[in-house]
């Protein structure tokens, strides 16, 4: 939708326009970081357009909170590292931006894995590459680097991220398959696909593409076969907060 102060955004289109430090693109995951990026914008001695992606689902999210101290001290964090894990125990680093972080965080708490670090990219452009590479050096035992996004593979930030990091780390994507439209058109299909992304990040999926680059080809766009599978599992109303918990989709 569109209103007096906002419009629906296509992240990949804004990122295509980024060059020569012409604009700033941010996707904040905490109230304090949102506050500080606005504060920084006004405080700076120069003016460059600031694009901020702010999904409505985080407005009242129980995990999306900041303390008063977070507002009154510090500044905008271009990258937020995972402080809940021991770097030497991590063998997989997942990079992401935006609200999908909270879905992965919820699953990470359930799994209590301890071997997966989730790093949030809060500023997409200018991309803080040196800062990110410095953070990644902490994870010396990590060989698997993932970019996780809920958008289709040809949308979102994936292609932008890949072009920046491909020469430095071997990174692969977990996302929806490439699509001509940003939405599936089916709420059931959307929820299953969303959970499938989380399952693949935490290796709960036994798809043969699990250890390869995943663009959810195991589901694809096979609407009829998908609807039949839903009927086989007697799935009528799907709770987005629950796992699909069924046989792997084919």
Regions found by a protein language model. Give the residues of each.
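Thiamine diphosphate
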Residues: 1-10, 44-47, 59-248
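Conserved thiamine diphosphate
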Residues: 1-44
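Generic detector of short, locally flexible boundary/turn motifs and exposed helical patches
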Residues: 15-19, 55-56, 109-114
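General beta-strand structural signal in soluble alpha/beta enzymes
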Residues: 25-29, 52-54, 147
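Short acidic/polar capping segments at secondary-structure boundaries
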Residues: 31-33, 56-58, 99
């Amino acid at each position: 939708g569109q209103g007096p102060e906002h419009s629906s955004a296509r992240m990949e289109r804004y990122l295509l326009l980024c060059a020569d430090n012409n604009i700033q693109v941010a996707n904040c995951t905490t109230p304090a970081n949102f506050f500080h990026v606005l504060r920084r914008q006004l405080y700076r001695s120069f003016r460059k357009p600031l694009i901020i992606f702010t999904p409505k689902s985080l407005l009242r999210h129980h995990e999306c909170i900041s303390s008063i101290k977070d507002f009154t001290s510090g500044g905008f964090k271009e990258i937020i590292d995972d402080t809940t894990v021991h770097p030497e125990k991590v063998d997989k680093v997942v990079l992401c931006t935006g609200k999908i972080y909270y879905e992965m965080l919820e699953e990470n708490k359930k799994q209590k894995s301890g071997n997966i670090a989730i790093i949030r990219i809060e500023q997409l452009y200018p991309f803080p590459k040196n800062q990110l590479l410095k953070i990644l050096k902490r994870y010396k035992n990590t060989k698997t680097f993932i970019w996780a996004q809920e958008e289709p593979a040809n949308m979102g930030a994936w292609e932008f991220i890949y072009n920046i990091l491909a020469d430095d780390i071997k990174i692969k994507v977990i996302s929806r398959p490439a699509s001509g439209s940003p939405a599936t058109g089916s709420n059931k299909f959307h929820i299953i696909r969303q959970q499938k992304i989380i399952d693949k990040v935490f290796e709960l999926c036994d798809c043969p593409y699990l250890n390869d680059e995943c663009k959810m080809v195991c589901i694809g766009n096979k609407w009829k076969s998908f609807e039949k599978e839903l009927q086989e599992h007697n799935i009528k109303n799907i709770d987005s907060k629950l796992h699909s918990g069924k046989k792997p989709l084919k």
